[in-house]
Each structure stands twice: as structure tokens, then as C-alpha cells.
Amino acid sequence: SFQSARAAYLRGTKNSLYEGGIRMPFLIKYPKKIKAGQVNNESVLCAVDLYPSLCAIAGIETEKGYQGDGQNYDKVLLGKSKAKRKTDLMWDFGRNQFFKKPGNANDRSPHLAIRSGNWKLLINSDGSDAQLYDIEKDKFEKNDVAQSHPEVVAKLSKKVCKWFEENKD
């Protein structure tokens, strides 16, 4: 169906923290700087990385005192390299009585997620519904490996729940 095809057959839709709701293509055109037709499906970037990366490409300094979460991936955007993230990515998709959940129950994710290296943990802030995926091996999020990696679940849930508590206002 169109519903599943629009997210490249990944699990999830908008309003979900599964890959189908958060993974997006990014196109960039910069004639004479970037060779046309290049594709990079390996590097993991986030919107917060755009400001420091585009400033570096433009040859300008970030705003004085800037302490954002983004990393400079100018070489990745220019097609000169591929990069592994050095820091974790975290998401909170707030839930309340007004929130519209995805219609398909399989697309309804917990409201917190953290991506750390190849691991992606989804969990609710009360510790319920922990799901762990090795995104490099399972980008469709079909094989929850939380039971076989309790140490990873404990480490990542502590990080993302702490982040949520510090940033929920």
C-alpha cells in the first residue's frame, strides 16, 4: 500500500519514533562544490547538525557562545567523506490526550528514543515498553533484542530518561 511505501517500507509513520517516522532523505545541491549524483546512505546526521555544518561550508563562524547539540559534518555534506556519529541522538515525541497516534498499532512507538552507534532504544519515560534494535542489521525494526542485551537497555534507558527529565519543560 501507499502507506508503507511512503516510508521506504520502514516500520513507523509520522507521529512515531520508528525509522519510518524519523529517517528522512536529505538532498543538497552546491554546483562546483558537490559532484552530482552522489549518494551516502551510511552517515547519520540530524537537523541540529545543519547549522554548524553549513556555517563551516560557508566559511563563517557559528554565533558567539553557540553551544548547540549539532556536530560539524561539512565534509559529509560536500561528499568528501562518510562519518559515524560521535554523540547520541535522542527524541521525545510527546504524548497527551490531544496527541494523534498512528492508526496501525505496529507503528505506535514508545515516546522516547535514543540512537547510540548501531543501537536504537525506544522506551517510555516510566521505563515501560523498552525495545532495542541493531539499526545497522535491522533497519526495519523487526527483531527486538532487548531481552538479550539488558546491559545496553539499562545504559541507554538511563541516558534517555535523564535527558527527558532535564528537557521536558
Model segments located where?
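C-terminal cap/loop subdomain of S1 sulfatases and analogous C-terminal strand-loop tails that border
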Residues: 1-17, 34-43, 48-135, 166-167
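Charge-dense polyanion-binding interfaces
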Residues: 155-169
